[in-house]
Amino acid sequence: MPTSVPRGAPFLLLPPLLMLSAVLAVPVDRAAPPQEDSQATETPDTGLYYHRYLQEVINVLETDGHFREKLQAANAEDIKSGKLSQELDFVSHNVRTKLDELKRQEVSRLRMLLKAKMDAKQEPNLQVDHMNLLKQFEHLDPQNQHTFEARDLELLIQTATRDLAQYDAAHHEEFKRYEMLKEHERRRYLESLGEEQRKEAERKLQEQQRRHREHPKVNVPGSQAQLKEVWEELDGLDPNRFNPKTFFILHDINSDGVLDEQELEALFTKELEKVYDPKNEEDDMREMEEERLRMREHVMKNVDTNQDRLVTLEEFLASTQRKEFGDTGEGWKTVEMSPAYTEEELKRFEEELAAREAELNARAQRLSQETEALGRSQDRLEAQKRELQQAVLQMEQRKQQLQEQSAPPSKPDGQLQFRADTDDAPVPAPAGDQKDVPASEKKVPEQPPELPQLDSQHL
């Protein structure tokens, strides 16, 4: 019989790496009044580049009564295979309209991303086939960019399921590269030191490693010893009265009937605190997060029998009946006891770093040469600018000189003075100006000839 969808888990995909079947699950009890929690926990980001679109689609689908009923009767396989997607044809018009708008917004967002990507890599005038590029986004149907159809929901479910399943592997690969880079830098640092300094640095490193290894025994995650320790130290209960069912209910924080990945990882905190302390120089918090992920994967592998990334009460109780539950041997092997890389992998990584460094150096050299060329060009432009300014100044000065030479002279009071022509008769000076001239030299104006007077009698 297929496993039914767990009730009360509408947002379980949104904690990192959970299946979409958990996301779309809804509470069975319709009579239960909605709980108003003003301080509700914000749903964590899945890390998917379409996380917001996924969250909004889920929120809209939850508002449709028909779809919720079908979800209650569905199983994880129906959801993952896309069978449930066909029920989208029966949702209300209002819900379909909202889904259509969400898809148009997502297509618009992806187009903007593509444009930015192409602008950064290619010539600005290059024509881009956005329709073809949209096909690389597998969580929606690029052939229909305006309406949200059953195919869109099917693609969204399948893509999210696949991407989330690959998330852990990507995290492990990232951690491996982090560890290799750390070792590479450590070796380069030691090579840069003198012999005495190198010996001192190596001694200090060995001392840090020794302190890091000195910690209490770490219990195997999911074992009886590990769960009892949580029961006693975290829950404050009597270890002799350990009850798996009660334990499950206590740590099902959101009371949805399953332990999701975040709820499981919370159980490992006490074990991690035995090994890692943020105050200690020798303890790497990146290693602690890798340790947490490895612990969760171990529990899921041994307890999550249907591999839906959720632990039901039945699965949890069944795991407590196995022999491995009580027999943990020497305990859990931590990260430093299980190297993340081999020497051969480190060698290839260093070759890759060397090639990248050479490429960056060549690029830096080209940029330096271009900068120098630009500097020389700038100097030439500045010199030409100064020459042009000097030429303009000289032209202005010459123009001013020409204007001064062509203008008539002015009297002391600023009035213009015009010169008389030399060929004209001299103009006598005003009377006031002749007072200093000798009387003998003064010219008397000639009198007109006197006409004879006629006698009126002769007329």
Curated annotation (Swiss-Prot):
Residue ranges annotated as coiled coil are 149-217, 340-407
- Gene Ontology molecular-function annotations: calcium ion binding; DNA binding; G-protein alpha-subunit binding; guanyl-nucleotide exchange factor activity
Phosphothreonine carried by residues: 147
Q: Which UniProt keywords apply?
A: Calcium, Coiled coil, Cytoplasm, DNA-binding, Golgi apparatus, Guanine-nucleotide releasing factor, Membrane, Metal-binding, Phosphoprotein, Repeat, Secreted, Signal
Instruction: Output the GO biological process annotations, alphabetical, semicolon-separated.
Output: small GTPase-mediated signal transduction
Membrane-topology descriptor: Peripheral membrane protein
List every position bearing Phosphoserine. Answer: 85, 368, 456
One GO cellular component, as annotated: extracellular region
Domain EF-hand positions: 239-274, 291-326
Question: Which parts of the sequence bind Ca(2+) 2?
Answer: 304, 306, 308, 315
Q: Which residues bind DNA?
A: 171-217
Q: Where is this region: Disordered?
A: 192-220, 368-459
InterPro entries, per the entry: EF-hand-dom_pair, EF_Hand_1_Ca_BS, EF_hand_dom, Nucleobindin
> Where does the secretion signal sit in this chain?
1-25
| Ranges for region Binds to GNAI2 and GNAI3 | 227-320
Major location category of this protein: Golgi
The sequence motif named GBA is recorded at 302-332
The UniProt subunit note reads as follows: Interacts (via GBA motif) with guanine nucleotide-binding protein G(i) alpha subunits GNAI1, GNAI2 and GNAI3 with higher affinity for GNAI1 and GNAI3 than for GNAI2. Preferentially interacts with inactive rather than active GNAI3. Interaction with GNAI3 is inhibited when NUCB1 binds calcium, probably due to a conformational change which renders the GBA motif inaccessible.
Quote the record's domain comment. The EF-hand domains are unfolded in the absence of Ca(2+) and fold upon Ca(2+) addition.
The misc remark on file is:
Discovered as DNA-binding protein in the serum of lupus-prone mice.
Regarding protein family, the annotation reads: Belongs to the nucleobindin family.
Its biological function?
A: Major calcium-binding protein of the Golgi which may have a role in calcium homeostasis. Acts as a non-receptor guanine nucleotide exchange factor which binds to and activates alpha subunits of guanine nucleotide-binding proteins (G proteins).
Query: What name does UniProt use for this protein?
Result: Nucleobindin-1
What organism does the record attribute this protein to?
Mus musculus (Mouse)
